[in-house]
Regions:
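Short acidic-glycine-tyrosine-enriched beta hairpin
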Residues: 79-95
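Short, conserved beta-strand element in jelly-roll/cupin
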Residues: 51, 60-75
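Ligand-binding loop in jelly-roll beta-barrel domains
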Residues: 89, 95-115
Length: 115
């Protein structure tokens, strides 16, 4: 459950508070939204995302920062570089980056999308 006022957003999460996360008409994992907009209409999205092992293309449609909480995720960038995220790792990607994500172990992240 998320509470959002003009001054802050606060969330308490249970398993039932996640919903399908849909990209390009396909559900890829589940999301719990903490915040869905910034001040004065600015793009600012914050949430938790979780997934069982799977692989899928993921275009970064805005700047995104990821803090890995559980499991392992391998992000293959179009440049050929691989970014592996495990609990405690933080990575930030710029808008327009094309990637393929491979969840190798059940994975959970906190994410912030801006731009």
């Amino acid at each position: 459950m998320t509470t959002q006022t003009a001054e802050y957003a606060r969330s308490l999460i249970t398993a039932e508070d996640f919903e399908p996360f849909v990209v390009g008409g396909e559900a890829i994992g589940e999301v719990h939204w903490i915040r869905t907009e910034g001040a004065e209409g600015a793009t600012l999205v914050v949430g938790l995302w979780r997934s069982e092992p799977q692989s899928f293309p993921y275009p970064f449609t805005a700047d995104e920062t990821i803090h890995a909480l559980e499991g392992e995720l391998v992000i293959d960038l179009e440049s050929g570089e691989k970014v592996t995220l495990r609990p405690g790792d933080i990575a930030s990607f710029i808008k327009g980056t094309k990637s393929t994500w491979t969840v190798t172990q059940p994975f959970k992240k906190l994410f912030v999308i801006s731009g």
